[in-house]
Amino acid sequence: MSEPELKLVARRIRSFPDFPIPGVLFRDISPLLKDPDSFRASIRLLASHLKSTHSGKIDYIAGLDSRGFLFGPSLAQELGVGCVLIRKQGKLPGPTVSASYSLEYGKAELEIQKDALEPGQRVVIVDDLLATGGTMFAACDLLHQLRAEVVECVSLVELTSLKGRERLGPIPFFSLLQYD
């Protein structure tokens, strides 16, 4: 992994205490999105990891609603694969599959269209941040319901003190930046 690129990405993440509720330290990626060099570096770093780990054996990137949508299509394009969307409840037309999950600060439900993937297709799930792992775990559940293979979950930021990685069990997880 390129240390200069990683530092470029890290400098563009800022913190807001007590947002959206007291006791939560929000990691804001907005400065990263404003800076094309930093954003490109984040995509290159994630793609480099996935290329070296999976040797081109990825069929799709699944972007999580909503900030995973910012990285999913660019990462998919960099890897030369398709991108599918995992949305919050009620946002997708047609038949869907759903799974409930807990956030760091609430509860919600995710959905994916039933025809989004074929059984056996190899998928990487991407989001901006891993906290408790609830969203990623629900996304894995959705893809397993479609009989797709989740080969890895990735995010820009990981909040290690919340142990979200452990919630994913045997599914590999990778993050560019780790914060306590």
Swiss-Prot record:
SUPFAM superfamilies (alphabetical): PRTase-like (SSF53271)
Keywords: Acetylation, Cytoplasm, Glycosyltransferase, Phosphoprotein, Purine salvage, Transferase
Residue(s) carrying N-acetylserine: S2
Catalytic activity annotation: AMP + diphosphate = 5-phospho-alpha-D-ribose 1-diphosphate + adenine
Stored CDD domains: PRTases_typeI (cd06223)
Principal EC category: transferase
Pfam families attached to this UniProt entry: Pribosyltran
Residue(s) carrying Phosphotyrosine: Y60
Residues annotated with N6-acetyllysine modification: K114
Family note: Belongs to the purine/pyrimidine phosphoribosyltransferase family.
PANTHER family, sorted: ADENINE PHOSPHORIBOSYLTRANSFERASE
Protein name, as recorded: Adenine phosphoribosyltransferase
Organism encoding this protein: Mus musculus
Record lineage: Eukaryota, Metazoa, Chordata, Craniata, Vertebrata
